[in-house]
Amino acid sequence: MLIPATQAHAARHMEVALQDDQVFLNQSWYGRAKAFQKAEQLGVTRLRVNFIWAREIRGAKRRHAPKDPGYNWYHFDSLIDEAAAHGIRIEMTLTGPAPAWATGNHRMGVYKPRASAFKRFVRDVVTHFKGRVDRYSIWNEPNWKSWLKPHRSAPHLYKLLYLAGYREIKHIDPKAKVLIGETSPQARGRAGMAPLTFLRRMVGHSHLFADGYAHHPYDYARSPHKRSKGRNDVTIATLGRLTHQLSVLRRKHRLRTRTGHVLPLYLTEYGYFAKGPRWLGNKRRAAYLRKGFQIALHNPSVREMTQYTLVAPPHGAVWDTSLVSSTGAPSSAFRSLSSWTLGAVRVGGIARAPR
């Protein structure tokens, strides 16, 4: 067992989280009920789900905003109810692509989404889920060009979106937590801005509040202990870069909690590829995944660690960081993580689902 007897330096009651929207939300394959059984075996107490603006609102291709927009609520409502039956809470990321009437080029997508339109979207969503969803985050991977552009303007665009979303959520449901960031881990030329570069440019000289910072600390090809070379990148091995930057921003009163504290970390996507050119082999993958969760647990700033995807997608899918096959057969990575979470629960390191 890789969990020490004392948890003095560990994140107290860290949540183990999971995301697989195609399985849990859209029910595109496998089956939601069976997926929840697997989630319980992993010790999951939190399920992250993306509420994609243009996908869930009716008439997203229209150039003019409808007076009374309609949304596809049912699959979210049923997911929340089923998750609650398993002692699992929902964390919802409110994100683009945006409908055509809300973008700078009047096309459905991620080009210059207007904060005023996003505010109304957030109002509708939070009003509907008030009292049933207790944690939101604003936009997915805003430092990645495929989620927000123009790329150079992304920090400023994101700040406007975040402020609109944060204020609306706190007005409607003051008890709900709001996370800022949802950043990807590394710079990728013109495709992706390094998360620390993005964070500093986004905050600037503002005075922002949040309940936590959400980040995706992937490092697909290397050990969780191997530090990335980019000084503004943040992988699982270099979380200290992010906690240091958040401490600096708190000290300067640029970004902090309402009570004046440094933002805690919510690691809302993580995993290693199950196949393809970035597959590391089953044994190494299982060991790396387990070590990644252990690193998160031992960081006192981390409140949540999320495995991204559970079930293998159909043949031909580009992204596969799943832990079980299409028929539910557990991989060595699944067994390793399940064993680790069981041990962590026993010593009080991670949150336990209520019974």
Where are these regions (language model features)?
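Aromatic-rich peripheral "rim/lid" segments of glycoside hydrolase catalytic domains that contact
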Residues: 59, 64-67, 91, 128, ...
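Conserved, mostly hydrophobic/aromatic
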Residues: 18, 47, 83, 125, ...
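Non-catalytic positions within long, well-ordered alpha-helices that form the structural scaffold/packing
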Residues: 37-40, 84, 206, 297-298
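Structural recognition of alpha->loop->beta junctions
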Residues: 123-136, 199-212, 295-303
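Substrate-binding cleft and catalytic face of glycoside hydrolase catalytic domains
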Residues: 42-188, 220
